[in-house]
Each structure stands twice: as C-alpha cells, then as structure tokens.
Regions:
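S-adenosyl-L-methionine
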Residues: 18-73
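Short SAM/SAH-binding signature in class I
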Residues: 56, 78-87
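Short glycine-rich, flexible loops that bind phosphorylated cofactors or substrates
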Residues: 91-92
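A short glycine-rich, Lys/Arg-flanked "PGG" loop and its adjoining helix->strand segment in the class I
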Residues: 95-111
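A short helix->loop->beta-strand "cap" motif at the edges of active sites that frequently abuts
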Residues: 2-4, 109-113
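Class I S-adenosyl-L-methionine
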Residues: 121-169
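Conserved beta-strand signature within the Rossmann-like core of class I S-adenosyl-L-methionine
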Residues: 82-84, 111-119
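Conserved SAM-binding motif I beta-strand of class I
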Residues: 5-10
Length: 169
C-alpha cells in the first residue's frame, strides 16, 4: 500500500445540498457514503487525514493563478507525481488551455510524473509536447470519451532540464 496525498483545486465548489442531490454514494456504494461526505466536508486550505493512507488538501481558488509566480500568495509550489487535468473544453475555458500553464505544470511534476486529461485535441497534444512532455493518446473510459491524453515528464527531458539549470549557475 502507498500513502496518497491528494490536492484538489476548485474555483467553484459545490454546496453540500447539491452534493446530496447528486447522490453519488449510490454509484460508488453505500458502504463508502461516510468517506464520500467526509471528503466533501473537509475544511479548505488545510490538510485533512481522511484515513491513515489518504490525506486531502482542498484548495478553493483559481487554478490559473495558484501556479502563477507573480499572483501566487503561497510561499512555495509543491511537487506532484500525477496531475489529473479535468478542465472544461478549450472553447469553454480558454484560460485553462494556455501554453504558459502547461509549461508550469511540467515544472511542478516530479521526474516520471504524469499529467492526464480527457481533452485529446491536437492543439492540446502539441502544447503538452512543447512544454516538454512525451504524449500518448489512449482509449478513453467505457461510456465516456473516445480518447484521452497521457503526458509524461520523461527521465531524458528531466535530465536535460536539470543539466540546463546547472549550466546557468
């Protein structure tokens, strides 16, 4: 077993009444209902141990500003192993699909880290590649999107980035 530290960033969190109306526990099983509501009731901007194996850090804020060094109020940007990029389509949320954001996400991923998104458009794939990722198109989930993208920060890319930084000092 591995311990999981999950950070979720939500600009417009759902009200508890809306969560109850959605009734997701009937999909995940009533045995998980208590955990489901514990996750949603966890306080914002603080780490919460949901179980000995799962720590949750919910951030209420604008994702595009949290990783912007000029606008960011947090003192340090954490590093991640996996980023599940679940934004609306580029036509609906263009600010979430800018090259500078993918460049930053690349930087906050650990070596070998993965970014995955349901948006498999060519323009998104090319932006991820420009940021330095190795990108693969994979079959989407059953009953959902036809394809997804998996972008990996490869060892070679990470080594080149590290070598470039050390040569600048």
């Amino acid at each position: 077993r591995r311990k999981v530290h999950y950070t979720g960033i939500e600009r417009y969190p759902l009200a508890e009444e809306t969560l109850k109306q959605l009734d997701y526990p009937h999909l995940i099983g009533k045995q998980h209902e208590e955990d489901y509501y514990a996750i949603h009731r966890a306080p914002w901007d603080t780490e919460t141990a949901v179980s000995p194996w799962f720590t949750l850090h919910k951030i209420e804020g604008d994702f595009t500003r949290l990783f912007n060094p000029v606008e960011r109020s947090r003192p340090a940007v954490p590093r991640y192993d996996i980023i599940y990029f679940d934004a609306f389509a580029p036509e609906k949320q263009p600010e979430m699909w800018e090259q500078s954001l993918f460049d930053t996400l690349y930087k906050v991923l650990n070596d070998g880290g993965i970014l995955t998104t349901y948006c498999a458009k060519g323009v998104v794939r090319r932006m991820l590649q420009t940021a330095g990722f190795t990108v693969e198109r994979l079959p989407g989930p059953p009953g959902g999107k036809r394809e997804i993208l998996r972008a990996t920060k490869s060892d070679q890319t990470f080594k080149a980035e590290t070598d470039e930084r050390s040569s600048l000092t």
